[in-house]
């Protein structure tokens, strides 16, 4: 009986790993959360970030936080995510970004990118 359980565990593990690996029809996807600190509210950060993310084909959302920072959660190909993070480090004209705190998150499968209020 222990052998059957081990084989079943191996099968489940292989199925999980195969779902996480990119295929030719489905590119590798990651999800990242960034907290952007500095003078980032009242300068059009959310709208600009949303346009950039949509142009790059990313999914997720952006919102203001009560402490004056902005939170971005985005998922998509790692190259596009790196481009969005680089943009977040500068922000739109008028923003003064002091710090970007990154955190990798589990992929959720969002359907679009939106501004949250």
UniProtKB/Swiss-Prot annotation:
Ranges in coiled-coil conformation: none
Matching SUPFAM superfamilies: Acylphosphatase/BLUF domain-like
Protein name, entry field: Acylphosphatase
Protein family: Belongs to the acylphosphatase family.
Residues making up the signal peptide according to the UniProt record: none
Listed NCBIfam families: PRK14452.1
Keyword Methyltransferase attributed: no
Organism domain of life: Bacteria
Gene3D superfamilies assigned to the protein according to its UniProt record, in alphabetical order: 3.30.70.100
Keywords: Hydrolase
UniProt-listed Enzyme Commission number(s): 3.6.1.7
Active-site residues annotated for this sequence: 46, 64
């Amino acid at each position: 009986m222990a052998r059957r359980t081990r084989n079943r565990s191996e099968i489940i593990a292989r199925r999980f790993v195969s779902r996480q690996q990119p295929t030719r029809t489905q590119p590798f996807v990651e999800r990242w959360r960034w907290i952007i600190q500095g003078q980032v509210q009242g300068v059009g950060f959310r709208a600009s970030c949303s346009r950039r993310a949509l142009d790059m084909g990313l999914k997720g959302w952006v919102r203001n936080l009560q402490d004056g920072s902005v939170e971005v959660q985005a998922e998509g190909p790692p190259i596009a995510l790196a481009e969005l993070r680089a943009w977040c480090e500068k922000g739109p004209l008028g923003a003064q970004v002091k710090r970007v705190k990154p955190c990798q998150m589990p992929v959720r499968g969002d359907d679009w990118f939106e501004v949250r209020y």
